[in-house]
């Protein structure tokens, strides 16, 4: 998020932009640990409008920034089992359509036809959007970073924000592990750490971090030497999410990527397996 903001501000003509990265490598936090999904299927108008802009950027990323990001628009499919979930998604579906999202409402037969590996048990309906997809997070980060630097953005690595200086209610500086930086404008692009940055200026940002696990299972080689593409349905490239259990999966390289949230997981920055 930080490199994207820096790049777009520089494109608009802003100068003296400094991006602070606490780690040695860009994207070493939640960005580098995510599954790379990008979707339009959200429940709030603001999220949908932002995502429409984001998908537009990803679709023209290579042409505009010269960086391949392996953006595959194979779609997201949400599987719906509970009656309450069905009602919520119907409202979301209507909002998404009103805002121009090419989302489809699928009955059970159509959902199973598009994703033959799923079970019909308890399934009531599904939603699908073909503009949703997956990109390589590292390539997106590096593409934005390189383009931002070409426009004059300074990127400081291994520099941690430790405080924000104020004069009355106006920002005067950023306090960092490498010393203060005078500024009157700060963009909080800290992701899961946004709440901690907000507290430096007595602002409550309602963001909480939760540990999640992603697994990748290799598919055994075929005795006849057939490639994975020839042995699996194209539907396995769809990022399929069982909304009520949070289980999701999609094909990843020569295997299957899958994950699931733990409803009892407490909020923390814990990253152990």
List each model region and its residues:
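Central helical "cap/lid" subdomain
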Residues: 27, 179-236
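Helical element adjacent to the flavin cofactor pocket in flavoenzyme catalytic cores
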Residues: 127-185, 193
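Dinucleotide-binding Rossmann-like beta1-alpha1 core, especially the glycine-rich loop
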Residues: 35-114, 246-248
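A short, glycine/Asx- and small/polar-enriched loop/turn
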Residues: 84, 115-123, 165-172
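N-terminal Rossmann-fold NAD(P) dinucleotide-binding loop
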Residues: 2-3
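Gly/Ala-rich phosphate-binding loop of Rossmann-like dinucleotide-binding domains
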Residues: 6, 10-11, 147
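Active-site lid/adjacent beta-loop-alpha segment flanking the redox-cofactor pocket in flavoenzymes
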Residues: 204, 220-273
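Glycine-rich FAD pyrophosphate-binding loop
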Residues: 10-31
